[in-house]
Amino acid sequence: MEGENSKSVHPILSHSTSVVSERASSSGVNGTNGGMKQVSPVSTARTSIARRPPSTVGSQTGSLVNAPPKRSSGIERFDHVTGTAENRPQTPSTKASVANVKPAGAAESAQNANLISSKSENVPEPAGEKVSMPEKQDLQSALPSDAVSNAVIGWKSIYHASDVDVHDHFANVLSALQWDSHRVEPSILETYSSYKLTGQWWQSTSILLAVSILSWIASKLWFRFFILFFIIITGTIVYGSCMISVRRNIREEVVQELSKKNGDVDYETMSWFNTLLQRFWMLNEPEISKSVSTSVEQSIAEYLPSFIKEAAFSTFTLGSKAPRIDRVRTHPPVERDVVLMDVDFSLTPNDNYDVNDSSLKCRVNSLISLVIKFGFGKYMFSFPITIKDLRLSGKLRIRWGLSSDYPFIQTASFSFLETPIVYANIRPIDIPFLDADIFYIPGIGQFVSEQLGLLLNSMVLWPNMFDYDLSAMMAGIASGTAVGVVGLKIYSARRGEVSDSSIDRKPSSFITVTTSGREHGRTPIRSNTFSPTFDTTIYVVINSLNDPLKLSLYDNSGKSPILVGTTYIDPRSLYERGFIGDIYQFLYNAVNVGSVAFDATFFPSLLPKKTMDGSKIEPPESSKGILNVNLGCVNNLTELTELTKKSSLKYVLYVDSKEVASKTIKFVDRTPISLQTNAYIENNKKSSIKVAVFDVKSPEKAIATVSVPLPELLHEGYDTFHFVENPKATIDIESFWTPVDVVEEKSAKTYIDNLVGVMRLSVIKANDLVNVELPTRKSDPYARVIVGNSVVARTVYTPNNLNPIWNEILYVPIMADTKTIDLEAMDYEESGNDRSLGYASINVQKYIRNAKRLDRSALASTVFGTSEVNALTLTSRKGQSVRGTISVNCDYRPCLRLNTDNSSKQSSENVQSATDPTTPAKDNSTSNAETSSITSVISVNEALQYPSGFALISIVSADLQDVGVDLRVFTDNAAFPFITTPIAKTKTPRWSSFGISMVRELQFSETTFQLTDGAKKDPKVVCEHSVKTLDLVSEALGRPYSVEIPGSNGQLNHVRLSITYMPVPMTLNPMESYINSGSLHFMLQDGQNLPIGDIRSSDPFVVLKLNGESAFKSKVIKKNLNPVWNEEADIVVQNRVLDVLELVCYDWDMGEKPDVLGTSNIDLLSLEPNVESQQSIKLDSKTGTINASLRFVPGWHRRKAVLDVTLADNFLHAANKGAKLVVGGVGAAGGLALAGVTTIGSVGSKAVTGVADGVTGTGKHIISGAKGISKMGMFRRSLEKNPSRSDLTTTQEASSSASVPPAIAPESANAALTSTIDKTTGAPELAQKKYKVYVGQGKNMPHKTIKIIVTDNQDHSFKTKSRKGPSPSWNEEIPVKWSLGDELRISAVTSNLLGHTKLGEAVFQEDAIGTFRVVIGGSSSVEIKVEAE
């Protein structure tokens, strides 16, 4: 009995800690529980179950506890999650399986087979413990309410037969199919005859013919039956031997072919993946089947005819065998960030070839049973349709589009390389004894295959592909969202002339543009010409890259238009290339009937992106985009007119009075219309939609209309709107907006017309920023400026610092509709998206009103910038929690407009609305009077007299020497480009990109054009060329211009562009001047009377430190107090005012740290530009002088970007396919440390220092001085924290020496720089001042008595009085002699009986006066106030 029990136990799920087995109760042996199955969780160790005596089946111990049996008239289904069995009614398909169930434990007994009967009425309830299983919702409860009751979902619900039966059945099937698979012995004929059968076709034919003739002769001659029997036996033996030979020959040929070298070496198997997929499938197939069945039921319910009341699945399972990846082939890379692979897949639930023994025991075939209920009234009938033995196989091509942003795969495109093979056993009438498979009908299989091919051909059959945007899916964007917009500009067409001389006329023509039968626009009609010129731009919304753009040429000479010819544009090629400009041929009946010249540009949809931390990055705001509309339910239409069930209504949707979609359905009140469409909108602030309802019987007049302005519709998103005719009748309208960055030819001019001024932001510092990094490090903050969800400017980041100091100047263009701008602190991430640390809003209108008080001359003579510092509170975007403070000062200047032919009414309207939004637009006289002092129109010659202004460059096209490069445009020493074009796919790309840059000094400004390899991280420069901005403005102002960029091979790359210059009346802050940056040529000559470092002598060498970082190191002169070096180096100086150049003389020691012999600071401001200065630099030691020659050469040296991603990708989008509108120039747009290059904190692993690639010089050392972007520590000067010094700005008028005209000489500019710095800051006095230090109020202190101890550099300690927490207030002055930059140690202690306990300690070191909060431990902090004496 024990052995029998062990054989009967077969786990359903193998390789798991708990499996399910089915065994008959022991009471069934005695006839008390016949037919009942007892289901219990058991262990995978079969031996422990096998040794259990039969008498303990009803009462198990330990963890093996069985549930008491229940009475059932049908089949029990065991729930593997809850551990319970539920009764299931018997169906015709399940009754047969019940009759074949053998009780486990006595499977060999014939008596037990008779126990499967209906004698289970009086079943005793055996004693035993109930199974305690985790609770979970049953699968049936998740089915839709309209589904068929007790529907069978998933393979686990199907599996209810005995394991032994299933195993024996498939073993018999395999043995029957493989009866001769290993046969090697000779046949009977081969044993007793020398004749060998080779399996040729004529041998089989001869055997059949001989058997037929001999049988006929035997019957004709009336022989006995045994003669006929002998003939049949002999023929069978011979034929069997022949078939064995056939199989043997086939195997030999297969082995012969397999022995050959396989040509498909690129294909790989995916056994490991199939193993994982099988395990995943076994666990999740029920949920997958439930989800699929539910969605399919809901989909087909919308299309059911009226006589079909319900269609639901009674059984749905895809089988227990998972789909398989048979093999995979990955293509060699042909495009950047694209992976292409071919996959052979199959779904064969009824195939056991590759199923292991454990999976075979619980194998369930696919089974889908759809029950359709039809009829009328009480006469309802059910019609079951059963689909089983589903088989699907095919070849799939998958194209992965990779991305550097999360989820790192942008798009996944799928395409069938050939029509997939589909077969299934479909029975319209599911009767067990009637095999009514529709595939038995001749030709039906081929018909289904052909129809499937026709269906897939236009959707996913190669080269058509089904595209899925994974990043959009992660961001919650619904599938089916438009891919983008195609701007199609049709220039002209050509038609073949009529050969018939009797027709003496010229035709009238027009062209239509359609996709999938929907017309998007048409050109004007051009009459009496064979070569019509249209110059018309049509915008087409692209919903799928598989739908070609159809251009149709019509002849409008007759009463109705006649089709002349058609041509097609592939949107997928356009999507990949970005631009197509060509001449296509019109064809009619495969005959060339004309041509069309066009330019097509693809503008992708701007979709939100989801980051790895779960936050969502919204796309930039744009007035151009795609409006997606879905018309929902219409309610109470009977309030408007009399309608019956036979009435048919037509719903028409208009966008800006143009019909875009319509739908006609039968009238049913409160029924969804389900009319979905989209349309391209040029300006969402001025557009509107209209819905009209027509009765089909009287379509001339609408019975109901409703109009909704687009801003209101987009603001609501989904709302109910009332019809105009009767407010009781309503319609539900759902809409969402997809912005698209469409760049038109007039976009640059439109941008200039809307540009009213510039905001100067001096981002000084931030305090108490939140830490979003791990506890072992701190955030890497930077600040960025956001206008309308677009990042238009940013600073460099400060590594590992929660109190960063930037002192950077950013220039932000202000448009007519700009009300506020956001200043946001971000944490820089080397990989992934940066994280927000908090943001603050700045009201632009306040500064515009301040600028209105000054006329043009006053604006031009006033230094651009203020001394007012605003400490803005940073808050989180979610929850509005405080995240720290950021200190900035702001100023605004208007722009002056050039006097052009359309100079304009719109410009003055935009300026008026920007300068005073409360003034009515119709009051033009008042508007002009108020704004004439701010913004006026000047001539081109007058514009060139202004040294500062905005330069807008429009890149039109290029002639390149190579493909795969992009164009980047820089201004002056900008770290980041203000224009970045898409990667050129051809040698003649048409980019249509533009960007705007702030030019501070037109006389000295330079514009650099750079061709790179297009990499976002560390792009490789192919070639570059710099031109004077003044020459560029003079030559290209308002007209096309070509810039030549020499290549590495000597050939020229031509870039065609135009430029617009808008002056800004201002006096430039001298710190931002060209004269303040450049290259320092340092000639180290000799030293005299150096101090003695070792015994009687020294081994001196000299190190130059720029902002604390080594910029030059001389050689070591051994044992000499008067060394001679004669070494030279060039050092890049980005800011003479803030950069600190220190000379340090060391004594070299072997194996030890060098000793300092003396130091001295070199005053960079005292150097005259381009003048050699011979200096004897005295060391701070008792003796020692260093003789050196210094020459400062002003110039622009581009800084190296600290971020590894091109900053233009985050800027305001203004060009197609990634070309961004940015604010460039020195100090503009991004990361340009104009006023604080040297004060951005210590350089960590993320920082990029140096600009060695952009510096040239002579001598042994060409040193990069851009290490001013470096740690300052003790070199932080008062300029960084003192607004009046760091910004060097005042509201008073600058002196005449500071007002530098365009043609100023460098020497006089240097004098102006020095003079202004001395006047505005008083630098000598600043260093001599002393300050008072106060201890203010504590915060988040413990509830104890606390005192503060302050220790200075001399280790002198000062204690405050004791105060009670948690918010003690001291307000005590600390009698310490302290200067800016000195360190103070602040510690908090509590007193107790045993002494003092230190709560925490912090180092206080600041370079400015004001109130600061010092964190001394955990969240505890104390205010430290610094005042000047």
From Swiss-Prot:
Biased composition annotated in UniProt, kind: Polar residues: 109-121
Any one biological process term the GO annotation gives: endoplasmic reticulum-plasma membrane tethering
Alphabetical list of SMART domains matching this protein: C2 (SM00239)
MF annotations from Gene Ontology: lipid binding; phospholipid binding; protein-membrane adaptor activity
Transmembrane regions listed in the UniProt entry: 197-217, 225-245
Pfam families: C2, C2_TCB1
Domain SMP-LTD per the UniProt entry, residue ranges: 266-471
Annotated segments matching region Disordered: 1-76, 103-130, 899-932, 1280-1303
Composition skew (Low complexity), residue ranges: 14-29, 1294-1303
UniProt keyword annotations, A-Z: Lipid transport, Lipid-binding, Membrane, Repeat, Transmembrane, Transmembrane helix, Transport
Main localization, broad class: membrane
CDD domains named in the record: C2C_Tricalbin-like, SMP_TCB
Record GO cellular component, one term: endoplasmic reticulum
Domain C2: from-to ranges: 462-584, 738-858, 1060-1177
UniProt topology in membrane: Multi-pass membrane protein
InterPro entries, sorted: C2_dom, C2_domain_sf, C2C_Tricalbin, SMP_LBD, TCB1-3_C2, Tricalbin, Tricalbin_domain
Coiled-coil intervals, chain numbering: none
Compartments, record wording: Membrane
Protein name: Uncharacterized protein C962.01
Source organism: Schizosaccharomyces pombe (strain 972 / ATCC 24843)
